[in-house]
Amino acid sequence: MKKIILAVMMLIGTSTAFAGDSEPLKAILKAQNYAEAANLVQSTLDQLAGNEEKAKAYNRLYELAMKKVNYEEGIQLENETQKQMGKEGNKPVDEKGLYAAVGAAFNSGVEAIKYDNMPNQKGKVKPKYAALVESVYKLRNDLINGGVYYQGKDDKMAYKYLAEYVESAGYPEFASF
């Protein structure tokens, strides 16, 4: 009887040990802004349990960066709509922040896709973020806009965005496009 109880206790103990996310991943998923999450990912990347957790962490970075992108693009759209209606759209757009967020979202999305397509701890590839590929691919157009925005202002940044656009055409993550 003692052996059965001991075996059941060991089974419960091992199943709970492997059931949830690691502590570093939980901290990354709780982060409320991109800078905080990026620092956590950078400092704890080697502590994440496997490729699935790394993909989850980079997906969280992508989501946080896209909040800024969507917010600023919403303001741009609202300003354009106001102009078309004959009113003055005068809400300020943080273009520098927008394109920084575009770059961060693109890079985080590519990393999430990369880790998502790597074998898990069992040696099997089970992509969970397949829908992310199309969303990240669409950000390539914003890389061009970022390069154009920085032309004449900051040549290094302009080159960075335009070069990223050109180089990303050959990324294996985007082979289906």
Question: Across the structure, where does each feature detected by a protein language model lie?
Answer:
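Sec-dependent N-terminal signal peptides
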Residues: 4-13
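Short coil/linker segments at helix-helix boundaries
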Residues: 64-153, 169-176
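Single-residue signature of alpha-solenoid repeat helices
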Residues: 37, 102-105, 158
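Alpha-solenoid helical repeat scaffolds
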Residues: 42, 107-110, 160-166
